[in-house]
């Protein structure tokens, strides 16, 4: 169960894709997530990304978990789900659509956005250090 939660939390960068209006930004986020997804299970990259994921607002974590449950195969573990994203990052679009439906931007609070910004900074640093 812990591994599943880690995976669900890790995909929260999808929220950035959902918010991004700039196609270059969306592509950069997708490349980063693919980098994390294709990393070896238990790797330093995935471990560090999990630490970043812990910085996200609780409501977003819950929404992402629900969306991963809806869009990923039932019973798949964290590594299997990462493998799906590695093989086809199009799954991120499905998760993003689910997040937008369940948590419209109009309902995201200023405090949640501030908390999410901490996560984005952590993920950005990790991307620059490990995925470029």
Swiss-Prot record:
Q: Where in the cell is it found?
A: Secreted
* Span of the signal peptide: 1-20
Chief site of localization:
secreted
Give the UniProt keywords, A-Z: Disulfide bond, Ion channel impairing toxin, Secreted, Signal, Toxin
Q: What is this protein called?
A: U10-hexatoxin-Hi1a
How would you describe the post-translational modification of this protein? Answer: Contains 5 disulfide bonds.
Show the GO MF annotations: ion channel regulator activity; toxin activity
* This protein's record includes keyword Disulfide bond: yes
What is known about what this protein does? Probable ion channel inhibitor.
Q: In which tissues is it expressed?
A: Expressed by the venom gland.
GO CC, sorted alphabetically, is: extracellular region
């Amino acid at each position: 169960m812990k591994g599943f939660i880690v995976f669900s939390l890790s995909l929260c960068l999808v929220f950035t894709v959902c918010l991004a209006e700039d196609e270059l930004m969306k592509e950069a986020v997708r490349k980063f997530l693919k980098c994390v997804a294709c990393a070896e299970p238990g790797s330093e990259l995935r471990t560090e990304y999990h630490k970043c994921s812990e910085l996200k607002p609780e409501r977003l974590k819950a929404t992402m978990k629900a969306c991963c449950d809806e869009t990923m195969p039932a019973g798949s573990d964290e590594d299997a789900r990462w493998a799906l994203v590695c093989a086809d990052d199009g799954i991120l679009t499905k998760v993003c659509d689910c997040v937008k439906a369940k948590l419209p931007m109009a309902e995201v609070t200023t405090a949640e956005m501030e908390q999410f910004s901490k996560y984005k900074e952590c993920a950005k640093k990790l991307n620059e250090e490990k995925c470029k």
